């Protein structure tokens, strides 16, 4: 082609005519100017062709033997550039410039312009660049446009435009549709493995098609690249570092990267792993917990919503998910230490191979053989992120609660071992210990463990108040225990097959083997649900002093119900609960819901009266046929009045009382407070009286007649008091009225307090124990009488109970929460003439019952309608004429207990001081008739 252009130029210089030759037929190439008819002057340039040369018919033809490759390149563009403006019109408008539009001008014009540039010496390097063999059409056009733009920029300076950065490549031609501009942007780059930010200046050269016209040119507007925020840049950097760490890590850790990326917590991954992956997961967690992992910690927080990685194996494993072959603490510690010693870049042990993947080599290997293609396919499957079958919800902690890193303490609990040689030495030592443990034979456990009985001497207790007291008085010193305390400790529960029953039950009972009896009864009785027990003192019952024997040995069952510690300097001494014996079951057979009997415990030994000790805390015995009501948590602590108290006031025996109301069990079941004693020949249990806050049950069951079996008199030790149930004939009274030096016993037999209560006015009955309690506490309540209690007292009077002979001489104070009703002496009433006369049994007559006004004539008052408590009020009733004498006026103290639904009456003569002396209250303040406040009924 170069030779053809040179020959054409020589012909033009020679001026030879070529009219005989046919002009070249360009066919569908459009209007193409005939370039080369005249020589190109250096002043015009390669792209500035004259219009006269285009119209000259004498111009030489273009060589037809063009390069075949050039023609192949021209053919696809022929159809595109046929339409549009005629290039000749453009040349006429701009005679000194040929506009070569890439979207309209055919490519052959550019080819001619390039070859024309070869004729100029200064443009030959540009022509040689265009004639490069490796250029395609797009690159060829781009180079032409660059040369054109540069030539125009040299001739004409760019127009000044507002917000113009440096210079723009503009065109003054309206047909030019492309604009260029540069834009500078400062961005921050990150440093791998740290938080340091480096500013980088980025210069972008932008171009747009069909840009907004500015002045006489088309150009693009200013494009502002949005700058990423610091938080987003931190997050993107963290994810980039996590992906890099996953690519560099060992293959066994990539699973954990994928699971954490999908939002799973470490605990969810831990409980779902198999046995073979647990050690690797512990190493991965150890690598996550490295302190210098800034980006990895941020990646973990963004994925899971947790502030930092924790040890999931410290939490309890769920029961529903099996946990086979658990790891020991030594294995977990060693695996965690290996993870802590790993490199910060990726979780990799020193022995793990480094896999380098080359994309080009892998493509060549895939093309060589099909087998290697299958292997590469498996490798590509391994690279797919692994996820759990479910998609867990990520709950993130609000940013308000995120603490700064500088506010956290940097204390290290232990040193982190970073040397793998030390870790390997520790692993070897652990492996030797594990092998030694497996070689040792296991010790065979014994078939049955014995029951060990621990005996300890009684503890010493200094005398003094134990808890908060409501009545300030001096305490009686504690009495010593009868002997060493025996506590049964059951090491292992014996199996049911170990208990062998020899013979029948009758033979077992005839042999009187108490130990075997306890075992058999324990196997036959159903298990008892444990009832919550409060820390109150159980009732103390007398055995040694009163001559009462108990056939209940110490039970061997473990103590399940433990009492709460009472207020005091020493802890409670807990004794095991006792199971019911055969005698108790036989005695409680007629009634399936009886009041539980207290356990008998001695309170003093006559051999060593000076030994001071504290009585043990006893729990109420279990009652199998009857459900127990839970006792309130607040304990009931008091020292009751001794049974046979002397008449004179004794300051050392003033009781300490702190009464907390609670609901008794018999009030829930519906039984009267008095129950007959069991008739066993070797068992005599004291009955348990009702507390002060008894509520009348809505219905009374069928009353039971007590068995008419007189109790067997026992020989009591010397100096022990006599237990006296409510008698009918009290002993000879020893009471001294005011002003009388010597007490004068009445000649006739006086009635008992129970008979007085039976003959009292209706609605004013009640045991004297309630009167004594009201005197101690001071609060008196009002309510309806209890028909059930009246029937019980009538049965008691009909049964004819007799007290035990004799009376105690020594005084005792027993730690118990329940009062035993004392025997009240007959009260001497001052007559009208001033002489003391004994009040006979028939002196007390009926008086009208006084109810509350709003409940008068309505019926029995339910416990829920009980009005608030009232104070004691004293009223005087005129008694009618009695059989043994005239009418006498005596003040009647009406004690009304609303909480119990009873109105109790204590007829007394003389002053309140005599009453306290008679009851043994000492100096306890009781409201006198003159100072008592009369309470309103409403």
From Swiss-Prot:
Ranges annotated as biased composition (Basic and acidic residues): 78-92, 430-440
Pfam family, one: EBV-NA3
Cellular localization per UniProt: Host nucleus
Chain spans, region Disordered: 1-92, 360-389, 430-470, 528-628, 694-752, 849-870, 910-938
UniProt feature, compositional bias: Low complexity: 575-594, 927-938
One Gene Ontology cellular component annotation held by this UniProt entry: host cell nucleus
Record keywords, A-Z: Host nucleus, Host-virus interaction, Transcription, Transcription regulation
Acidic residues biased stretches: 360-374
Keyword Transcription regulation assigned: yes
Broad class of the protein's primary localization: host cell
Biased composition (Polar residues): 601-615
Coiled-coil ranges per UniProt: none
Summary of subunit composition and partner proteins: Interacts (via N-terminus) with host RBPJ.
Similarity annotation: Belongs to the herpesviridae EBNA-4 family.
Record function comment: May be involved in transcriptional regulation of both viral and cellular genes by interacting with the host DNA-binding protein RBPJ.
Protein name: Epstein-Barr nuclear antigen 4
